[in-house]
Amino acid sequence: GFTSFNVIRYTDDIEIKDSTASRNDAPDLLYILYRYIIVFKGFRHEMELVALDRDNEHADIERIANRINNNNFRTYDFHAVGGTTSTLTDEQHRENIRQGIKHCRRGDVFQIVMSRRFEQRYTGDDFNLYRALRSVNPSPYLFYFDFGSFRIFGSSPETHCRIEGNNAYID
C-alpha cells in the first residue's frame, strides 16, 4: 500500500496546500492485506509466490503458477502524446530546494524530499513504462500497484548500499 504526503494533515497540525491533482482519484492512504503476493527479484531474474492463506494454499498456488507459466500475456505499446508539463517552473523548484536547505541548516528537519510533479499524456500500457523504468533504474525499491481505478508505480533513486572496489558503503 501507500501513504501520500497529504496524510500529514491528519497526523500533525500543519497547514499544507492540497497537492492532489483534480483528476487524481487515489485516496490519501491505502493498505491492503493480500492473500497472494508475487515478488519479483529483478537482480536474480526470479519470482517468488507468497501465500498468506494456509487453508487452500497448494491448490491456489498451483493455479496461479500455471497462469504465470502460461507466458501468453497481452502487451500493448506505450507512446507519449504531446509534451511534458509540471506543477512548478524550474526556478520555483530551485527556490523550494533553497528553502529546504535553510530548514536543514536551522535544524527544523533532518531530511527533506523535494518532489516535483510531472505529467505526460500517453497511449498504451503503463506497465511497459514500469518495465522500462526497471531496466534503466534497477532500484531494489521498485513498485507497481494496480488498484483497478488507479495505478501507482515508481522507484527510489537513492543508494543505500554501494560497493566500490573492495569497499562497501552504507549511505
Task: Please state what every model-predicted region is.
Residues 2-171:
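Extended alpha-helical targeting/anchoring segments
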